[in-house]
Amino acid sequence: MAKTKYEVTYIIKPDIDEDSKKALIDRFDKVVTDNGAEELESKDWGKRRFAYEIEKYREGTYHIMTFVAENSEPVDEFGRLSRIDNQVLRSMTVKLDK
């Protein structure tokens, strides 16, 4: 089966401390790899101001992860867990061209 390349961008609440932020990022990286994906890159974009408020926040910490997977299981599990976690304000997953 052909592997598909995905990019996930998620926004973390700005008031979370550094240790908790690192633990959150590590947990989401592990969720993706535990579900059969190969992580290519995981990088922090830092704090950025929003164009509009999200859950009463005017800024958030952006994080981007790129990975390849044979099926959508890592994407589905990441989406499910990011919606449950109250430290994540928003997330978006896109399928990249080969």
UniProtKB/Swiss-Prot annotation:
It comes from the Bacteria. One of its GO terms (cellular component) is ribonucleoprotein complex. Coiled coil: none annotated. The keyword RNA-binding applies. One of its GO terms (molecular function) is structural constituent of ribosome. InterPro entries: Ribosomal_bS6 (IPR000529), Ribosomal_bS6_sf (IPR035980), Ribosomal_S6_plastid/chlpt (IPR020814), Transl_elong_EF1B/ribsomal_bS6 (IPR014717). The keyword Cell inner membrane does not apply. CDD domains: bS6. GO terms for biological process: translation. Keywords: Ribonucleoprotein, Ribosomal protein, RNA-binding, rRNA-binding. HAMAP family: Ribosomal_bS6. Binds together with bS18 to 16S ribosomal RNA. Belongs to the bacterial ribosomal protein bS6 family. PANTHER family: MITOCHONDRIAL 28S RIBOSOMAL PROTEIN S6 (PTHR21011), SMALL RIBOSOMAL SUBUNIT PROTEIN BS6M (PTHR21011:SF1). This is Small ribosomal subunit protein bS6. The gene is rpsF.
